[in-house]
Amino acid sequence: MDIEKIEDLKKFVASCEENPSILLKPELSFFKDFIESFGGKIKKDKMGYEKMKSEDSTEEKSDEEEEDEEEEEEEEEDDDPEKLELIKEEAVECPPLAPIIEGELSEEQIEEICKLKEEAVDLVENKKYEEALEKYNKIISFGNPSAMIYTKRASILLNLKRPKACIRDCTEALNLNVDSANAYKIRAKAYRYLGKWEFAHADMEQGQKIDYDENLWDMQKLIQEKYKKIYEKRRYKINKEEEKQRLKREKELKKKLAAKKKAEKMYKENNKRENYDSDSSDSSYSEPDFSGDFPGGMPGGMPGMPGGMGGMGGMPGMPGGFPGMPGGMPGGMPGGMGGMPGMPGGMPGGMGGMPGMPGGMPDLNSPEMKELFNNPQFFQMMQNMMSNPDLINKYASDPKYKNIFENLKNSDLGGMMGEKPKP
């Protein structure tokens, strides 16, 4: 074997001797089981155990550890010197109960019973309990015994350390007389020797309530102390279980709240992502490209209407405004739409008819046209002038719209209205 390992083992054993509570750690349970398998017993060092307990306070105890602690507490209670007086239930059969008979006892039987009672009392005084028991068994065999007879035999059975039979006779006595104080007290003694402190406490309290006996005070005090310990221990277990359940419910509630919060967060993130995607798709819109549409105007134009349509009178001319549109549309594009002859006379001071479109429709892809269409003020201005022609002079003299008018004159629309576009 490795000498260094042996030295380490010696040091470990020495530390265990100084503080045996080390062996109570879960990781050393195998070593603790090994020691106990050879009959060894590990006792807690209170200071060391409390210190170790405080160090591991953040760790939760398992159910097995709690059960081990409870078993150790019970073992410590078993070492109580007061419990050395406890006796075990007897294995022998209980003495027979009285037979069921009809009618009343004869005078001879009554005389015999009285004689047996006197003999039994003398035997009890001389502590000849076995012989006294035989006398009471014979008395009960006649039938119809009183509650007192059963109580007397129960007292003898208790002296013979037969608590089970004693309890049975006391119960029979109470069935005959529920107010028999002696039956309660004797049965309380039997329960006390069996270590059934709760039953002993109930019977002793009831017996002393009916007929108080100061000679039983010491036993009554012992029973009360034991009962109090049992009650407190049971109350402690109940409170501990309730606290355990409460912590469990709180833990489950925290999990549910955390899951709910996480779900809400994911829901908000998904909505935010969907809104972002929607905004991105809307911002991807672009203006239509007119490239390739009607290059150089519509070739050939529309065939003219025979005779042409009478020209519409122009809009009333404004001083400094656009020149009047002369007569109707001329032939326009070759083979195109016939000019619309102007209305004779037109409106006084009005604008002449719209001249024909030389070369067809205006080129929508020209720089001037694109600049006009990209200017929102142009559409607003045109809409306002169509609803109120008097605004033409206002827009023409407004420096804000000067550039629009320049582009309009240079565009094909300006040519349509009599302006010559700049080359």
From Swiss-Prot:
Residues 46-60, 264-276 have a biased composition (Basic and acidic residues). Residues 61-82 have a biased composition (Acidic residues). GO terms for cellular component: cytoplasm. It is found in: Cytoplasm. Residues 361-423 form the STI1 domain. Residues 292-362 are annotated as: 19 X 3-4 AA approximate repeats. One of its GO terms (molecular function) is protein dimerization activity. Keywords: Chaperone, Cytoplasm, Repeat, TPR repeat. Residues 46-82, 260-301 are annotated as: Disordered. Disulfide bonds: none annotated. SMART domains: STI1 (SM00727), TPR (SM00028). It comes from the Eukaryota. GO terms for biological process: chaperone cofactor-dependent protein refolding. InterPro entries: Hip_N, STI1_HS-bd, TPR-like_helical_dom_sf, TPR_rpt. TPR repeats lie at residues 113-146, 147-180, 181-214. May play a role in protein folding or protein-protein interactions. May act as a co-chaperone. This is 58 kDa phosphoprotein.
